[in-house]
Regions:
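Bacterial N-terminal signal peptides
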Residues: 1-2
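Lipolytic serine-hydrolase domain surface
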Residues: 6-49, 62-66, 70-133, 152-355
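Alpha/beta-hydrolase fold active-site loops
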Residues: 53-54
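The conserved beta1-alpha1 loop
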Residues: 57-61, 140, 173
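Gly/Ala-rich beta-loop-alpha elbow adjacent to hydrolase catalytic centers
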Residues: 119, 138-139, 143, 147
Length: 355
């Protein structure tokens, strides 16, 4: 995972106001819980005494700073707005900014798992205040583990679909094991999660009305990546390119495929309310989704045996950009959206539920 280069900041200059943050609750060095975070209610965050009727919670993924979490949440809101789906979006911001290496990745998984209870408490408080409102959740990358942990927490206290707690969940490029959504009680689910987290199928079936998994077989953080690079960069007059396939950062550290790259494992049983969708075609080949620091995902080929430092933008084709699910800001006006990414399909599926 240390082979990929991430810009220092993927953040817009304008901060997004609607954030529920548990940052500072966990030690980024060892993942231990150092303080209990008492989150304000959703209505307090929205600065509104009236229930909104419908609310979305967005949960960001691994290695997002506080500012990046705000930027992504705002981008989800703007992308929804572009589809004429105008509802408030609250970002759930958690301690994901561990070291950008395999050790940091493992710590981030632990922190994500432990944040599930915090998210579950936040959800329950909102539904206690606004029992008739539809609550929707969108999670990106490792944020999917936060959400699955939250759903498990709700399931374990007896929440069912009859309680009308979670209307829908959308996972975008989920950085979790492709067996995690199984109805079967597989020991592997328990073994790969710290603290232990059972397979999520029963919790999904019981707690969530509609559950969607958006996967992308070209996602550069999750799937195998074919890199085309100039074999003779010193010669401007030839077109001598080499094709090399590298494992993704996820596949370099995990022993199984991610749910967000190829969908659920074919052998497992999943609940009827679980659906896989291949959204590769919705993720454009634009390398800079937030319009801040250029390419969203670079790799230094020297780390793979190249003789010199050679930074290569891995986003060259449809589906490559792991940060494109939430949409793409406009080059001329970054406060607007030029492409809604996979959020277009999210809004379409919400409308289909209503109709």
């Amino acid at each position: 995972m240390g082979f990929y280069s991430f810009p220092e900041s993927h953040a817009s200059t304008q901060s997004y106001p609607f954030i529920a943050s548990t940052r500072g609750s966990f030690d980024l060095a060892d993942g231990t819980n150092i303080q209990q975070e008492n989150l304000p209610s959703a209505l307090n965050i929205l600065n509104n005494d009236n229930c909104p009727g419908e609310l979305t919670i967005y949960v960001h993924g691994v290695w997002a700073s506080e500012q990046e979490a705000e930027e992504q949440t705002e981008r989800v809101f703007l992308s929804l707005l572009n589809t004429d789906y105008d509802i408030p979006v609250i970002g759930f911001s958690w301690d994901s900014n561990t070291a950008k290496n395999p050790t940091g990745w493992n710590l981030a998984k632990v922190i994500a798992n432990q944040n599930g209870q915090n998210l579950a408490n936040f959800i329950l408080e909102f539904k206690n205040q606004c029992p008739n409102d539809d609550l929707r959740i969108i999670a990106h990358s490792l944020g999917s583990k936060v959400v699955l942990s939250a759903i498990q927490s709700l399931y374990e206290i007896g929440i069912t679909n009859a309680d009308n707690i979670v209307k829908s969940v959308h996972l975008l490029g989920a950085a979790v094991d492709d067996e995690q959504v199984s109805l079967d009680k597989l020991q592997e689910c328990v073994n790969i999660n710290d603290p232990p987290l059972p397979c999520s199928g029963e919790a999904i079936e019981s707690v969530v009305s509609n559950f969607y998994n958006f996967y992308d077989s070209e996602d550069n953080m999750l799937a195998f990546e074919e890199v085309l690079f100039d074999a003779t960069p010193w010669n401007w007059f030839d077109d001598n390119f080499l094709s090399v396939t590298y494992p993704s950062p996820y596949l370099m550290t995990e022993t199984d495929n991610p749910l967000g790259a190829y969908g659920k494992q074919s052998e497992i049983n999943t609940p009827e309310n679980y659906q896989d969708y291949n959204v590769t075609a919705y993720i454009g080949n634009e390398p800079d989704s937030d319009k801040v620091n250029g390419c969203d995902l670079e790799v230094n080929l020297r780390n793979y045996g190249w003789l010199i430092d050679y930074y290569y933008c891995t986003i060259t084709k449809t589906g490559d950009n792991h940060f494109g699910y939430m949409g793409y800001r406009s080059e001329t006006n970054p406060q607007t959206i030029e492409d809604t990414g996979a959020i277009e399909l999210v809004a379409e599926q919400w409308r289909n539920e209503i109709n």
